[in-house]
Amino acid sequence: MMKQQFFLFLAVIVMISSVIEAGRGKEIMKNIKEKLTEVKDKMKHSWNKLTSMSEYACPVIEKWCEDHCAAKKAIGKCEDTECKCLKLRK
């Protein structure tokens, strides 16, 4: 009888520690999610700041714009941080 109570006691301790660890796991995942959200917001803010200055943004955007418009069979041109696709005449 004493052995059964001892093993039951150990099982309860293991279950309690598992529940505690599961709670910590959620806490850790929440912290990771918050950090990733902060990083995303900082990157978005930096990109918006960069693209607000057209003299810096156009060189960054231009290559993407050329490729984007080439897929549409057009010529890509960056104007005021916006990609303009000019249609090619046949």
UniProtKB/Swiss-Prot annotation:
Keyword Hydrolase applies: no
Maturation propeptide residues: 23-29
Reported tissue expression: Expressed by the venom gland.
Domain of life assignment: Eukaryota
Subcellular location: Secreted
GO cellular component: extracellular region
A GO term, aspect molecular function: toxin activity
Annotated BetaSPN-type CS-alpha/beta domain residues: 55-90
Signal peptide start-end: 1-22
Keywords: Disulfide bond, Ion channel impairing toxin, Neurotoxin, Potassium channel impairing toxin, Secreted, Signal, Toxin, Voltage-gated potassium channel impairing toxin
Disulfide bridge map: 58-78, 65-83, 69-85
Family, as annotated: Belongs to the long chain scorpion toxin family. Class 2 subfamily.
Function recorded in the entry: This recombinant peptide reversibly and dose-dependently inhibits the transient outward potassium current (I(To)) of rabbit atrial myocyte and prolongs the action potential duration of rabbit atrial myocyte without affecting the action potential amplitude. Thus, the voltage-gated potassium channels Kv4.1/KCND1, Kv4.2/KCND2, Kv4.3/KCND3 may be the target of this toxin.
Protein name stated in the entry: Potassium channel toxin BmTXK-beta
Source organism per UniProt: Olivierus martensii
